[in-house]
Design a protein with these regions (language model features):
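Active-site phosphate-binding strand-loop segment of PLP-dependent enzymes
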Residues: 101-184, 189-197
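Proline-centric
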Residues: 93, 249, 342-350
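Active-site region of PLP-dependent enzymes
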Residues: 154-160, 167-288, 321
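Conserved PLP-anchoring active-site segment centered on the Schiff-base-forming lysine
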Residues: 58-114, 120-122, 304
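Short beta-strand segments
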Residues: 51, 122-124, 175, 243, ...
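Generic structural signal for small/hydrophobic residues in well-ordered secondary structure
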Residues: 16, 38, 56, 72, ...
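Conserved PLP cofactor-binding pocket of PLP-dependent enzymes
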Residues: 207-220, 264, 297-341, 345
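Conserved PLP-binding active-site segment in aminotransferase class I/II-type PLP enzymes
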Residues: 1-63, 67, 88, 123, ...
Length: 351
């Protein structure tokens, strides 16, 4: 059966043994090289990598100064990883509804959820399908809110020809977990629009330490280097950074194959009783999966599994989970989740 997800690993990892035996395994040369390569690929100036998406999320929330009692507006139609960190930090998630055709935030619903405690809008681009970028950003700007793009599944997706991360959001968060492209076995990254937030995030990622001042002229810990912000142990190690760097060299061809598969699926499904997930204007999904809307979801999934393709609904709406509290009906979420099916569209096969 053709799997829905599959970890990619380059054939050429010739320097891996040297790194393993180098004695320099913590974040260093390869970590900085990966960050520079990602900056160039995405088209941004301020980016840090982390050892997981979850770590990136916690670093981001701390850097932005979001705290217990604050509210963030988000979509429940997302990976649990995309909303769980808010609960960890005591930040109240307020669910907005989604457009049942696209699976992404409905700008009017977002607008209606804003209160005096709202600090940010968290814009998930569901399964790589890009949401209403300008409309959601406008709501954030009009109300003095941070706009955070969630690219957990959307690396390489585009809006108006620009890759996600280069659209002007205050921050964009990425996952480099095993089934993402690229993957670093596990890892993540954050892009910042603002240099000051970026500088702060470098400290927050590394226990609040300014590494340029941490050691004195005898290489002892310097008493002159104060720790002024709380932080985490979230740097990405050299092995993972090297693997990510090698994958990034192949990323365009991998994404191109996913797009070719999407074209193949569109033709293959012409006579099926399904509709494609609607692609919002001026956007290009990365086709991490190929998304359709089926009236008989269970039957459609079973049918394609019997044909050798692992179809799946992928995510359960996070509003089902009691940790986020019961906030009432979300009709767009209900309709979309009852119909959405993901079909394999990955780099490892051809339709």
């Amino acid at each position: 059966m053709e799997s829905l997800f599959k970890p990619y690993m380059p054939k050429d990892l010739s320097e891996l043994q040297d790194i393993l035996c180098s004695g320099a395994l913590a974040y260093g040369k390869w970590g900085k090289m990966l960050e520079k390569s990602l900056q160039e690929y995405i088209g941004v100036d301020y980016l840090i990598t982390t050892n997981s998406y979850n770590s990136a999320f916690l670093v981001l929330l701390t850097t932005l100064g979001l705290k217990m009692g604050d509210e963030v507006i988000a979509s429940p139609m997302a990976c649990l990883a995309s909303n769980q960190p808010f609960a960890v930090m005591g930040i109240k998630v307020i669910w907005a509804d989604i457009d049942p055709r696209t699976g992404t935030l409905d700008p009017e619903s977002v607008k209606s959820k804003i209160t005096s405690r709202t600090r940010a809008i968290f814009h998930n681009h569901f399964c790589g399908y890009v949401g209403y970028v300008d409309e959601i950003c406008a709501v954030a700007r009009e109300n003095g809110l941070y706009i955070i793009d969630d690219a957990i599944e959307a690396f390489g997706s585009k809006y108006k020809g620009c890759k996600i991360g280069a659209w002007g959001a205050d921050a964009t968060i990425y996952s480099f977990q095993t089934v993402r492209l690229p993957n670093t076995i596990d890892g993540g990254a954050i892009v910042f629009k603002d240099e000051e937030l970026y500088i702060k995030s470098v400290l927050v990622r590394d226990y609040g330490i300014d590494r340029s001042r941490f050691r004195d002229d005898m290489n002892e810990i310097s008493s002159d280097c104060d720790i002024t912000v709380p932080g985490y142990g979230a740097t990405l190690n050299e092995i993972s950074s090297y693997i990510g760097s090698q994958q990034l060299n192949q990323i365009d061809s991998l994404l191109a194959q996913q797009k070719e598969n999407a074209i193949g699926w569109k033709k293959k499904l012409e006579n099926e009783n399904v509709t494609d997930v609607v692609i919002t204007g001026n956007t290009e999904p990365n086709y991490w999966v190929y998304g359709v809307l089926a009236d008989n979801k269970r039957d459609f999934i079973n049918s394609w599994r019997k044909k050798g393709f692992y179809a799946s609904g992928v995510h359960l709406p996070n509003s089902y989970y009691s940790i986020f509290g019961n906030q009432g009906e979300l009709y767009g979420v209900n309709e979309f989740s009852s119909r959405f099916v993901a079909l394999p569209s990955g780099w490892w096969f051809k339709i």
